[in-house]
C-alpha cells in the first residue's frame, strides 16, 4: 500500500503514530457523478451522461468496497453498459497492479498500464493521495469520474434506467432516511471497523475498534431477527454494503484482522442473511475467495510478514438459509 505525492509514487504504509495507533481512512478524491442527463450530482462537475459503452470499472475482486459496485452492476444488469478490468489481488510495493498472471485478473483492458497509479496520473498528473479501487472511468474523456464506492452504487442504481437497466430501486425514497442511518454506523463500526481493528498499532486502539465491531454485529443480529433485510423485506443498498464485509469476515477478518471473538457463522440471523444474498441469482459470480484470501494474507506485510494464508474457517454458503420462508 502506497500513495502518490504530487504525481510521484511512494511505497508507504499508513501512518498511525500521530493518531495513537488508530487507522484513519482517507476520503476519496474523485467525486463526480454519472447521471441520466449529465447534470451535476451532489459533488463534482457535470457532463458525465449515462451512455452505453462509455464507462469502465476498475476493480479488485478482493476489495469489499469494489465488490459493492460489482454487485450493483449485476443487480441492475449493467454488464452491457459498463466494462470491467480486474487488478491482480496482490498489492505490494507498487500498489495495485495489472499483472494478469493470477487467474481472474484481466490486466488493463483499456490502456495496458502496468500499475493502477498510472491510471490516476492519466487523470491528474499531479495527483496526491491513495490509489484505490473501485475506479469509475470515462472512456470518452479519459478521466476518472469517481473512486467513491458509496456514490458509484447510487449512480448505477438509477442512471441507466431509461437505457434498459433492470428494474429495481435499491435506494427508494421512502427508505432513504433509514438507509442513511444504517449506512452511517455500519460503515464506521463494521465496514471500516474491521480495518480499524486490523490496522491498529496500539492495544488501546485495537480494543476500542474490535469492541465496536462486535457490539454492532450483535445489534445487526437483532435487526435481522425481525425481518429479512435491514430495512424490512426489501433488499436495499444498506444490505449490499454490509454484505461485502460479512462475506470476508470468517475467511479473513477473524484471523488476519484479529476479529476473533465470534465468527459470522456463530450468529443465526447474520449467517442466514449472508447465505440468503449469496444465493441470489448472479451474486456468487461476484465472489472470488482466492483473490480475497491471497490479497489480505499476502499483501499486508506489516500485519502478516510471512504471507502465510490461514486454513479457514470454512463456510457452506450454499446451505439453505430459510429466510424466504421465515419472513415471506
UniProtKB/Swiss-Prot annotation:
Record note on what altering residue 195 to F does: 46-fold reduction in GS-hydroquinone reductase activity
GO cellular component: cytoplasm
Consequence of changing residue 63 to A: Loss of GS-hydroquinone reductase activity
Site feature location: Lowers pKa of active site Cys: 253, 296
Keyword Hydrolase tagged: no
Function: Catalyzes glutathione (GSH)-dependent reduction of glutathionyl-hydroquinones (GS-HQs) to the corresponding hydroquinones. Can use a variety of GS-HQs as substrates, such as GS-p-hydroquinone (GS-HQ), GS-hydroxy-p-hydroquinone (GS-HHQ), GS-methyl-p-hydroquinone (GS-MHQ), GS-menadiol, and GS-trichloro-p-hydroquinone (GS-TriCH). Also displays GSH-dependent disulfide-bond reduction activity toward HED (2-hydroxyethyl disulfide), and is able to catalyze DMA (dimethylarsinate) reduction. Exhibits no GSH transferase activity with 1-chloro-2,4-dinitrobenzene (CDNB).
Family, as annotated: Belongs to the GST superfamily. Xi-class GSH transferase family.
Protein name as annotated: Glutathionyl-hydroquinone reductase YqjG
Amino acid at each position: 500500500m502506497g500513495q502518490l505525492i504530487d504525481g510521484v509514487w511512494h511505497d508507504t504504509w499508513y501512518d498511525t503514530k500521530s493518531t495513537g495507533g488508530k487507522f484513519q481512512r482517507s476520503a476519496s478524491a474523485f467525486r463526480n457523478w454519472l447521471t441520466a442527463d449529465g447534470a451535476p450530482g451532489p459533488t463534482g462537475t457535470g457532463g458525465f451522461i449515462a451512455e452505453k459503452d462509455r464507462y469502465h470499472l476498475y476493480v479488485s475482486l478482493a476489495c469489499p468496497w469494489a465488490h459493492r459496485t460489482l454487485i450493483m452492476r449485476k443487480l441492475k444488469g449493467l454488464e452491457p453498459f459498463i466494462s470491467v478490468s480486474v487488478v491482480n489481488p496482490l498489492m505490494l510495493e507498487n500498489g495495485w497492479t495489472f499483472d494478469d498472471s493470477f487467474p481472474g485478473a484481466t490486466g488493463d483492458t483499456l490502456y495496458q498500464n502496468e500499475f493502477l497509479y498510472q491510471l490516476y496520473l492519466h487523470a491528474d498528473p499531479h495527483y496526491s493521495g491513495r490509489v484505490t479501487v473501485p475506479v469509475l472511468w470515462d472512456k470518452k474523456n479519459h478521466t476518472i469520474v469517481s473512486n467513491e464506492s458509496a456514490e458509484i452504487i447510487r449512480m448505477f442504481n438509477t442512471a441507466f434506467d431509461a437505457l434498459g437497466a433492470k428494474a429495481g430501486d435499491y435506494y427508494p425514497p421512502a427508505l432513504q432516511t433509514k438507509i442513511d442511518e444504517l449506512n452511517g454506523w455500519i460503515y464506521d463500526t463494521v465496514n471500516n471497523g474491521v480495518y480499524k481493528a486490523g490496522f491498529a498499532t496500539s492495544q488501546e486502539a485495537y480494543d476500542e475498534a474490535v469492541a465496536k465491531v462486535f457490539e454492532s454485529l450483535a445489534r445487526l443480529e437483532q435487526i435481522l431477527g425481525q425481518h429479512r433485510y435491514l430495512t424490512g423485506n426489501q433488499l436495499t443498498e444498506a444490505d449490499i454494503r454490509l454484505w461485502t464485509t460479512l462475506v470476508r469476515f470468517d475467511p479473513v477478518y477473524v484471523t488476519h484482522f484479529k476479529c476473533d471473538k465470534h465468527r459470522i457463522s456463530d450468529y443465526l440471523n447474520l449467517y442466514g442473511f449472508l447465505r440468503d444474498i449469496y444465493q441470489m441469482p448472479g451474486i456468487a459470480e461476484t465472489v472470488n475467495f482466492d483473490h480475497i484470501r491471497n490479497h489480505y494474507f499476502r499483501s499486508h506485510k506489516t500485519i502478516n510478514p510471512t504471507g502465510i494464508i490461514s486454513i479457514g474457517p470454512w463456510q457452506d454458503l450454499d446451505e439453505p438459509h430459510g429466510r424466504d420462508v421465515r419472513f415471506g
